[in-house]
Structures are given as C-alpha cells and as structure tokens.
Amino acid sequence: MADRRKLVMIVDDDQAVRDSLQFALRLEGLCVHVHNGGAALLADPSLNRAGCVVLGDRMRQMDGFTLLNTLQTSNPGVATIMLTSHATPRVRARAEAAGVWKVLEKPLLDNALVDDIRSIVGA
C-alpha cells in the first residue's frame, strides 16, 4: 500500500499536462494517479489515501471549483493545488476561499509544483 503522504492525484482534461506532471513527479519518487476529469478522480478507490490533489480549474465536464466542493465533503483535509491559465485576483481569491493550498499559473516553467508537493507530502 502506498504511503498516504506520497500519493498524488492529478486531475486535468489536458493529456499533455497529465503526462508531463506524472513524469516529473514519478522522477521524484512519488506515487501518482492521473485522471482526465473530476468524475474519474471521485471514482478512484485510492482517493482516500491521497496526500495531495493537483487539479485544473477549467475542466470540461466538472470544473475545478465544483470538484473542490465535492472533495471538501468526501475527503476533508486533503491538500489541493489548483493549476490555471487565468490566475486573476478573482480566481485566486475564490480558490483561497475554497481551501486551495496554492494556485499555480500554467505554463509551469520551474520546479514550483514539485517543491510545493514535496512540502505537502513530506518527500
């Protein structure tokens, strides 16, 4: 069984984002599950073991904020990092109010995400 702190869930409807994040995080020794949307994440039986959920804000079938609301009920306390191409003050404030640990703007050009996940999961 994976160490809860080191299980990272990635949810984004952009396959290139999922693939690149999965590759980078696995290089760091983290266990990573990827999903193409909120429904797929919520159906993953190992969600209750996740130390961190990285999610996009503008996914087609279930946007990131709707997913956050569901996660707060089903998995309270799981750390979330939101990825957005539109990091406006309004989006940041809404994410903060929803309990997001951090908002990062795409494209991710440095190791900020990896460093943040390391802080969350203790890796």
Predicted region positions:
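Acidic, metal-coordinating helix/loop segments flanking the phosphotransfer/catalytic sites
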Residues: V34-C52
